[in-house]
């Protein structure tokens, strides 16, 4: 009998999902991306060699694993082929193993132009997007004017839809942002020149997933970004433009909710955030700089430095609730090596409706509410020994084990996996999600 697992980030992204997905594909026959676009950045280290994927599922690095991009993903044709080319030059077979939903909305040059024009206009109030056109592409999807992947195979239909959205977006670019417009003919010619290279990978993904599941295949659904960036449940408006929670695995791939059996929530042993938005446990001191340096905290997509802070259990509890997390995987435990005293955020002081201060053990909804919160900490002793590469829980320093056990107690979810380094094999497994 097949078992299907959803892997999601429980923080603001960059939790180390790529490595864990790659590790789990040892027992999966298919890996599915179901939301986001090439704004995601999944870094994998295998045998000391680093690979960064933005759009293609992490399972592509495992021979004989089928990979799928579901309808919930927005696709840049050029970015897709750039990534395919990068993998093929590394000797990885992509074309026979990757299938992309014909219903995926496209990211076009007008979306990138609009994304960047908006960020410039916002000035100091910018959201901190990756500038890759993700948000505007999702807007077109919701407005029912998106160009979808299947439209590329019908020249006249593609031309008509492209003309419609360029009329709309060019008017905004020219008259509202005073920015250069996007040329229709150039966009059409450049996009159509890619069609024959993309065509072999396009398929009816919901049907393929249904058939694979019926045949007994284990499927792994790979989330991008993190639950606290979810368009509905995140720190709005400092969020991404898609649903990043486990439930999106169904709508973004076409598989039924009863076919999902386990949700693995990925969390760092501390907290990071890229771009703007409230971050109660953020550190601007030597500890924060230690975490950033040792954890190599720079965005895989943008290269921007990540903001670092203490572990925030109240934020994680919000993620656990909205995702129905079955178990946690704690990553980058080794980054905490050498920190003398650890602080674990267990909740917030916040103003109640009667303007009286109260304690909350769970993150409030919305950026404004979170920005007014003051974290409440518990202190625990750190450890001086190295945890790098440890694969057995009992071999961890006692202080590290106590730290993890306290995380479990506060968050009320079991820790099933622990990552002690960037390499695939530097992993402790307490309960295997597929078993």
Swiss-Prot record:
Q: What does this protein do?
A: Plays an important role in the de novo pathway of purine nucleotide biosynthesis. Catalyzes the first committed step in the biosynthesis of AMP from IMP.
Write down the species.
Nitrosospira multiformis (strain ATCC 25196 / NCIMB 11849 / C 71)
Q: Which Gene Ontology terms describe the biological processes this protein takes part in?
A: 'de novo' AMP biosynthetic process; IMP metabolic process
- Where does the protein end up? Cytoplasm
Give me the residues that bind substrate, please.
300-306
Care to name a GO molecular-function term for this sequence?
A: GTP binding
The annotation note on the cofactor reads:
Binds 1 Mg(2+) ion per subunit.
PROSITE patterns xrefs: ADENYLOSUCCIN_SYN_1, ADENYLOSUCCIN_SYN_2
Which Pfam families did the record assign? Answer: Adenylsucc_synt (PF00709)
User: Which residues are involved in binding Mg(2+)?
Assistant: 14, 41
Q: What is its EC number?
A: 6.3.4.4
Catalyzed reactions: IMP + L-aspartate + GTP = N(6)-(1,2-dicarboxyethyl)-AMP + GDP + phosphate + 2 H(+)
The protein's name in its UniProt record: Adenylosuccinate synthetase
Q: Which cofactor(s) does the record list?
A: Mg(2+)
